[in-house]
Amino acid sequence: MGMSLDPATETDEEIDIFIEDGKIAKRGKKLKCKAERVIDAAGSYVMPGFIDLHVHLRDPGYEEKETIASGVRAAAKGGYTTILAMPNTKPVVDNADVVSYVHKKAESEGLTRVLQVGAVTKGQQGEELADIKGMVQAGSPAISEDGKSVMRTDLYREAMKIAAECKIPVLAHCEDIHLVQGGVVNADEITKKQGLAGITNSVEDVIIARDIILAKETGARLHLCHCSTKDSVTMVKQAKADGLPVTAEVCPHHFTLSTEDMVPYDTNYKMNPPLRTKADVEALRQGLKEDIMDVIATDHAPHTKQDKNQSMQKAPFGIVGIETVAALTYSELVLKGYLTPMQMAEKMSYNPAKVIGSDRGSLEVGKDADIVIFNPKKTYQIDKNNFASKGRNTPFDGRTVTGEVEYTICGGKMIYEKEMTGEKA
């Protein structure tokens, strides 16, 4: 028996859950059922399996950074039962064939469920729309040009119209490329003293404003990826007040670290959007607390050691995060009073499911048995050398955190348990 947190029904109670044929068959106190295995979750939280709307699996084309196999192992270890893979691979996921390739390869692993997001434009070149309807028919739950924004507003508006017709969300990477001007970190006094070119908040905010306007015009469901600025929270709040179909996600690095935490010239602190100021961090935390910001996602972006072992100007943007997100969320948001444990479950499972129109993210009877068991008392240091991901590019190596995923169950199948790794819970 563990503390069940079900955001779908807003119930938190100590109950037993009985799984049969991959489904949640029964739930209640002191169930008497014949089971092949019993897991004692006393003292732990039992939550719906996490859903990550923002993962870079790098496959096809960049398998030296991550493979589908290593990516789903990392996801399972992080408590994820469903992840959305971004389309900026090689080739770009701009047609049904590549969507099917990823889905079949992920299914063969038998671990975390992978849903492949389709690109907005062919080759992500921003000039011609991809086969959006074909990709949706092949199983894409959403479209995104992640890694960049579609700068041709007329083309993007047309894509949003198609997305609305197909009843899928647009996952928006908001970055005005004309305002970046070679920036590699946030534009503030700290980074200026280091002689690094800065990325202003306006780079993100301008495109957020544009995309909200287009959502209003087209009726498309807009989901804003990796929001990092205080004004992003303000704009999302206003969009919701106006009744627009707008949701937003925040990543752990953006609600945990500011530019004051950066180790100078350490490329593991280089991501896009960049780390912002303390004021931005606090605004994001308050936005999550007040349920303005809906989702916690990772933007898991593995790179090789060689990739990152370059100057700040040359090294690629991105950090890994799928194995550290639960602990960081619990340590930085729950223990510090910004979120309740129920809100954590909501933002990591139920709300992401709603964004993509899925009925997952629930522990109700009859639902797929997608479950994560999370120990809220375990304190330890993050060790990048223990990652299942091929990527080791994290700014959190050595950081002391509280909270650990002990078991991940996907469709009734145990896909991760801590004891499998040889570690003691």
What is each model feature region?
Residues 41-106:
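Metal-associated gating/positioning segment near the N- to mid-region
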Residues 53-66, 87-89, 115-128, 195-202:
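Active-site mouth loops of central-metabolism enzymes
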Residues 96-113, 161-172, 324, 328:
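Alpha-helix-loop-beta-strand connector modules within alpha/beta enzyme cores
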Residues 193-221, 268, 289-296, 301-376:
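His/Asp/Glu-enriched, well-ordered alpha-helical/loop segment
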Residues 311-314, 368-425:
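C-terminal cap of metal-dependent C-N hydrolases
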